[in-house]
Amino acid sequence: MQYLNFPRMPNIMMFLEVAILCLWVVADASASSAKFGSTTPASAQQSDVELEPINGTLNYRLYAKKGRDDKPWFDGLDSRHIQCVRRARCYPTSNATNTCFGSKLPYELSSLDLTDFHTEKELNDKLNDYYALKHVPKCWAAIQPFLCAVFKPKCEKINGEDMVYLPSYEMCRITMEPCRILYNTTFFPKFLRCNETLFPTKCTNGARGMKFNGTGQCLSPLVPTDTSASYYPGIEGCGVRCKDPLYTDDEHRQIHKLIGWAGSICLLSNLFVVSTFFIDWKNANKYPAVIVFYINLCFLIACVGWLLQFTSGSREDIVCRKDGTLRHSEPTAGENLSCIVIFVLVYYFLTAGMVWFVFLTYAWHWRAMGHVQDRIDKKGSYFHLVAWSLPLVLTITTMAFSEVDGNSIVGICFVGYINHSMRAGLLLGPLCGVILIGGYFITRGMVMLFGLKHFANDIKSTSASNKIHLIIMRMGVCALLTLVFILVAIACHVTEFRHADEWAQSFRQFIICKISSVFEEKSSCRIENRPSVGVLQLHLLCLFSSGIVMSTWCWTPSSIETWKRYIRKKCGKEVVEEVKMPKHKVIAQTWAKRKDFEDKGRLSITLYNTHTDPVGLNFDVNDLNSSETNDISSTWAAYLPQCVKRRMALTGAATGNSSSHGPRKNSLDSEISVSVRHVSVESRRNSVDSQVSVKIAEMKTKVASRSRGKHGGSSSNRRTQRRRDYIAAATGKSSRRRESSTSVESQVIALKKTTYPNASHKVGVFAHHSSKKQHNYTSSMKRRTANAGLDPSILNEFLQKNGDFIFPFLQNQDMSSSSEEDNSRASQKIQDLNVVVKQQEISEDDHDGIKIEELPNSKQVALENFLKNIKKSNESNSNRHSRNSARSQSKKSQKRHLKNPAADLDFRKDCVKYRSNDSLSCSSEELDVALDVGSLLNSSFSGISMGKPHSRNSKTSCDVGIQANPFELVPSYGEDELQQAMRLLNAASRQRTEAANEDFGGTELQGLLGHSHRHQREPTFMSESDKLKMLLLPSK
């Protein structure tokens, strides 16, 4: 009991209190560790926790325990239990700041060492600024856990040191893609940039398990969308609204008003043209005028596509998608076809209009060159094929590449609003083609018309000259305006291409500024670089003005007359107006129906032309210089079927530089037609009087050749043959056929018309004498217009001076007359005429007629020989000779030359160079006969040279020409040249006669008739009075 010392009781109580306090501290530490979710056990301060340094950085990798056996996780494929830490200073969070973006943090200690802030208040203010990322929806959902792991990380003591848990590098990379629009801006500080030094790889973080509100909002001018194709670049979940943000609301109203007015005017203008063509389609359906109709039709349909946006709710339906974003990359699934329909209406028909414009320039160029209408009409099917198929190919290509984009400010869908390279290839490419091809044809056509205008003195009609001037002005103005509009449109497109990137970048900066300053009271964000509304207005004006310019082709008096006739017809007051057709068009119509004439024996043609087309482009350059009237006489109409039977038939051919007198290729075989100046005598009976009309025509020498080979021959062979024919015509050499004797004689007569135009020169047939006699026959001309009414005195003097020369040329000529009533045909021939006219004094008032008697003298003998040579040459004018016959011919000619060497020496000198292919051809420039036509002013003459009737190989056509003044024909020749020409003619006749006798062939007609018929063609002698009657009898 002694050891019990009660006074020591207070010491025991003190010891118990200390023990209880220690137990409470340990229990509290355990509870705190469980509260923060730490995997570190209560003995974390112990030295048994393993920390692995990461690549020599300040970061450590912490491996958690696997389970009861306390084995760590070293499996590299599972990083859920691997955490990364770094030494830091921890601070306890309060209840007010223990949240992050509205979610409560699962720990109470945090650290500021991962940021650049020094106080918790600064950190919270900056964290609130990141609420602006809600306007980048995809970014907002991905970046909230990362921001909480950086701004408010978990912090605790490990092995006795404060350690902060780090977010992983993968966690940082997740936020880069949806937040890329702001990632490289000042909105994201450097400590938020993904870096493996700051954020180790393959680490877990507790913040990833936190729940956040990830709902984002799209900031105007963006709208939310779930279609990835509609996302604005850099802002996933939002797309640009349908209304173009680069233009203000006021600018939208201006553009819509301009499209409405300009489109309506263009629509009405094109509708007027289309209606004008429809009401008079029969007269207007001719090229190139009908091309204007198709151009205006294309612009009309395109204007309809432009104006459809003004119907109720159509604009939004055309250019906007269902989610409110702008349409692009159409066609797409799930959307209506309104955008595609508008695209086809606008793009397809505008492109077709451009192609038709090129064809307009092409056809107009050919018309200005003077080519016939049929040559252009035959290409009509090709025009349609190209004009409608080429735009179709471009349209299908555009839709196949999904390059149809909408544009809200213009209210249509078009090609390449986003992909400018596609717009350059599918729009600007065809425009450049229009400029190049159309400009080429317009330039050539204008040069031709300017050439006609320059030589306007050759055009006798003032209206024709004014018509050329009007055509030049119309086409020139149209071409100039079209060129300007296309160039301005191309310039507008190029301006858009150049500045599109600047506008896009400026809009992007505007979006970033609005997102960054969303919580500012007064925002200073605006689009720095925007497209000019003036350029867009100019572009639209050029487009619609082009359609209006194309409609001006119908702003002519012809269109007004067309509407007048239409209105009178609808009101029951139609007036039949007949428009007479020019003679050359009647001949062309007759030739086109020659098959009907051959099969049925009768022909029905139209002598009245249609009215002028509304455009006025169906002009004929060949008509501009024509001085003939539209009056068609019965004689001319009766002779018209004969024109069909003859190749190269031209009646009423005009003089001048017209190109319509080119040869008509009417035969399958090669044709060579040489048209020279003709003088022929036509005897007509008008009432009781007998008249002799002399007509002078000047026609260009043309060679029309067609290959004899098969139709399948190459084009190079045809070009070579045409080149040879042209060279032969230019040099006067003919390698395949020779001219008939009648053709040579016609050339002789024609060239001597112009030898002595003055009265003082007396050569050959016609002589110009005293002024009284000139006045006398001039007065007689007044009896009948365009005919030389010669009284007996003039005719007597004519025969006295020239009878010994003109009658031989009438030898062997078929003077025929035909009648449509009884289909009768009579033919008489005047052969071997040896007439000498007795010269006598005739007073001015002497009208007793002509006194003729036969006086044999020395001249008659020479004339008989001359006539025999001509007769023999006419009988063998179309005979072909073989090489052997040519040799025998040359032998016989050598024998005859020995008898008369002096007469034939000049012939060999002048004609040997024209011998080619065993045929002889003497050019018209070297065959001259002493003629003088000075006394027959304003006279008319027609003759027919019948070599080989109905032959398909060679025909010579001497046709009626318009009147010309012989005094204006300047060329003259000397006496030596005339004598030389006569020698050439005589020698040619002798050689042909010898060749005919050698071959026993005669003419082709004689060969067909046979021996008995040949005897019937022997010359018969007639009395002088009968011969003169045959000369003066009327003949058609």
Swiss-Prot record:
InterPro entries: Frizzled/SFRP, Frizzled/Smoothened_7TM, Frizzled_dom, Frizzled_dom_sf, GPCR_2-like_7TM, SMO_7TM, SMO_CRD. Residues 32-258, 309-339, 403-421, 491-532 are extracellular. The modification Phosphoserine is found at S658, S659, S667, S670, S673, S687, S690, S693. The keyword Disulfide bond applies. Pfam families: Frizzled, Fz. Residues 678-745, 870-902 are annotated as: Disordered. Expressed in olfactory sensory neurons (at protein level). Keywords: Cell membrane, Cell projection, Developmental protein, Disulfide bond, G-protein coupled receptor, Glycoprotein, Membrane, Phosphoprotein, Receptor, Signal, Transducer, Transmembrane, Transmembrane helix. It is found in: Cell membrane; Cell projection, Cilium. Residues 880-899 have a biased composition (Basic residues). Its main location: membrane. Phosphorylation by CkIalpha and PKA regulates smo accumulation at the cell surface and its signaling activity in response to hh. It is a multi-pass membrane protein. GO terms for biological process: adenylate cyclase-inhibiting G protein-coupled receptor signaling pathway; anterior/posterior lineage restriction, imaginal disc; blastoderm segmentation; Bolwig's organ morphogenesis; central nervous system development; commissural neuron axon guidance; compound eye morphogenesis; eye-antennal disc morphogenesis. Disulfide bonds join C90-C155, C100-C148, C139-C179, C172-C194, C218-C238, C242-C320, C339-C413, C513-C525. Belongs to the G-protein coupled receptor Fz/Smo family. Interacts with cos. This is Protein smoothened. The gene is smo.
